[in-house]
Amino acid sequence: SWAVRALGCKAGIVCTASHNPSKYNGYKAYGADGCQMTIEAADIVLSKINAVPMFGGAKLVDFDEGIKSGMIEFIKQDVIEAYLDEVQKQQIHPEVCATSGLKVVYTPLNGTGNKPVRAILKRIGVSEVTVVPEQEMPDGHFPTCPFPNPEIKEALHLGLELCKTVKPDLLLATDPDCDRVGIAVPGKDGNYVLFSGNEVGAMLLEYICKERIALGKMPKNPVAVKSIVSTAIADEIAKDYGVEMRNVLTGFKFIGEQIGYLEAAGEADRFIFGFEESYGYLGGSYVRDKDAVIGSMLICEMAAYYRSIGVSLLEAREAMYK
């Protein structure tokens, strides 16, 4: 989503394992706006695909030959660094993580999150990060769990076991294509408590609203967006802070579509947060898709901020429900 926009591409394709069993791959198609294609655009593309003869209709090129000819180019590091710059700009309290002493256990579940998540945490000052060793390196066979989905407790087994010895303040787990992130925090009995996507989404919304208002960083007529199946608590939080909540169909592309509407009106800065209950979060309009890199950053910042005022994430969750 970022690279399509940054490089001025007409479209983008992601072949992804996502959170599915290893025998499956996903295929995500993005438009020039960096948003996954909505129904209308997808129908047009599908009609073009169906018109291509099954045998011999597609022109093929050898991958190595494509590299040699310059037809295929790898994204350079400056594109990645520019992306991380934009993520980092979405911080609300930039100083809080470096002074918090926050301790994190992280697992990318053998997916793609290892480098970007650790890079952003290092940038914001979270220095005590322990990665689950068996799940650190990319492996499309996902040998440690049949379903590498952070929504499923079994996928977090190794991370939770490591928590018993490291005793972190926070466990982060990103799915293989690093667009969703799950968390667990220490409970009162010493065991780690998993939060739902609805809970994290609502807590992030409340944190963003409260702290942006306190710091004078809230835009005029702010907008948040969530899927219609996500918690109604977020609607109440938005109402309390004077934020317009837009509810859209399931699928983050519809949240991205709303950001596009705001951008077309010259009002992209009105967008403050978007989420869906399946652990997908986005703060800022720099991309048009859910992003576990900024999700991880904001969760760590929120945890560090509450820690700085003597409140745990468990206590913050309880206060939200009250």
List PLM regions with ranges.
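Ferredoxin-reductase
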Residues: S1-A32
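Conserved phosphate-binding catalytic cores of ATP/NTP-utilizing and phosphoryl-transfer enzymes
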Residues: S1-K10, N149-D169, E257-A265
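Short Gly/Thr/Asp-enriched flexible loops that form oxyanion-binding sites at enzyme active sites
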Residues: Y24-A32, D179-N198, A234
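Gly/Ser/Thr-enriched, mixed-charge loops and adjacent short helices
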Residues: N25-L162
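Glycine-rich phosphate-binding loop plus the immediately following alpha-helix
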Residues: Y30-L60, N198-P222, K226-I237, A292, ...
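Accessory "access/gating" subregions that flank catalytic or transport cores
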Residues: Y106, K122, L158-T174, V181-P186
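Phosphate-binding and adjacent anionic-ligand microenvironments
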Residues: K164, P168-L170, T174, G190-V193, ...
